[in-house]
């Protein structure tokens, strides 16, 4: 099975547009030349708690089975002592996942599994490189822009940022698809509701199909009048994640597909073809991936 059947169409479309930006390769070169990747990792390793079989195994041990099923190396997992519920994946050279104490305290165990699978989805689908680029640009935007005189000017940075945000939103939908291989879309939706700060007593009474329909209604703006499309663009333009009802709708729709059901019920391994030779996941470098049944 071609991995493109797993990747959300909006993700593929946005990534193609992002890669078409002429200055992107030079921009990426500068970001890594300035050591942003190392800076972010050093801050992470000195301020967060690295989890393992010996360090809070009740959290860490949830990660390796997900990675094994996806055929990816197990990344380092860190716990940040922030009360704000959040998680992210970072690191181009050394990939790592961070979950916050607020997230662990807020989510039930099955919901935490969905979040970890979502983060592994970013690794599986090769999102981390562009996530690192986006984080660098939005963290050190002015400094980077000043250093790109003759390469990319201030005026050119805005469309780069917009393209990165568009892709970032779309990539979340792909990662949610990976989460749905391991967890029902309803579980993911409950986790999203908690991350939206919806109180527990409300979540217990919520009809998540109705909540997801709000996401459908919002996305329908894109297919309406020109003015509706502008409203949709204005609502999304500065966001790096889709709205949670949209994500719930997309996850529930994906859950009903044959592809999702097949991935849930069949063991598979990741392969890519290069001159008719199959290589291991960790040897890949921008090649075309496919999913193969090994059961």
Model-predicted segments: where are they?
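Hydrophobic or amphipathic, alpha-helical segments that drive membrane association/targeting
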Residues: 1-93, 162-164, 224, 232, ...
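Alpha-helical membrane-targeting segments
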Residues: 21-36, 133-163, 221-238
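Active-site-proximal gating segments in proteases and membrane effectors
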Residues: 23, 83-89, 180-281
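Short pre-active-site segment immediately N-terminal to the catalytic Zn-binding motif
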Residues: 50-54, 98-114, 163-166
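Residue-level signature of catalytic and energy-coupling elements of molecular machines
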Residues: 63, 99, 118, 175, ...
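Active-site His/Glu-centered metal-binding helix of metallohydrolases
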Residues: 107, 116-125, 174, 178
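Catalytic Zn2+-binding segment of zinc metalloproteases
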Residues: 120-140, 186
């Amino acid at each position: 099975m071609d991995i493109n059947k797993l990747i959300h169409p909006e993700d593929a479309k946005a990534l193609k547009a992002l890669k078409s930006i002429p200055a992107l390769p030079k921009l990426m070169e500068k970001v890594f030349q300035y050591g942003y990747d190392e800076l972010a990792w050093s801050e992470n390793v000195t301020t967060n708690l690295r989890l393992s079989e010996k360090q809070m195994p009740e959290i860490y041990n949830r990660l390796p089975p997900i990675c094994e099923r996806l055929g990816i190396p197990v990344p380092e997992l860190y716990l940040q002592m922030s009360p704000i519920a959040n998680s992210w994946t970072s690191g181009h050279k050394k990939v790592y996942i961070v979950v916050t104490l607020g997230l662990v305290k807020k989510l039930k165990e099955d919901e935490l599994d969905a979040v970890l699978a979502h983060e592994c989805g970013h690794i599986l689908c090769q999102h981390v490189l562009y996530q690192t680029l986006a984080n660098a640009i939005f963290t050190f935007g002015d400094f980077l822009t000043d250093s790109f005189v003759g390469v990319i000017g201030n005026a050119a940075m805005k469309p780069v940022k917009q393209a990165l945000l568009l892709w970032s939103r779309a990539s979340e939908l792909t990662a949610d698809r990976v989460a749905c291989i391991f967890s029902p879309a309803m579980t993911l939706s409950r986790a999203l509701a908690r991350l939206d700060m919806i109180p527990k007593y409300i979540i217990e009474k919520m009809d998540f199909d109705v909540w997801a329909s709000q996401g459908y209604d919002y996305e329908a703006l894109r297919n309406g009048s020109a003015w509706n499309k502008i409203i949709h663009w204005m609502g999304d333009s500065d966001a790096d994640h889709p709205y949670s009802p949209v994500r719930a709708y997309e996850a529930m729709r994906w859950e009903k597909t044959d592809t999702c059901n097949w991935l849930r019920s069949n063991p598979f391994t990741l392969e890519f073809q290069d001159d008719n030779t199959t290589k291991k996941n960790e040897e890949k470098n921008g090649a075309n991936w496919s999913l193969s049944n090994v059961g």
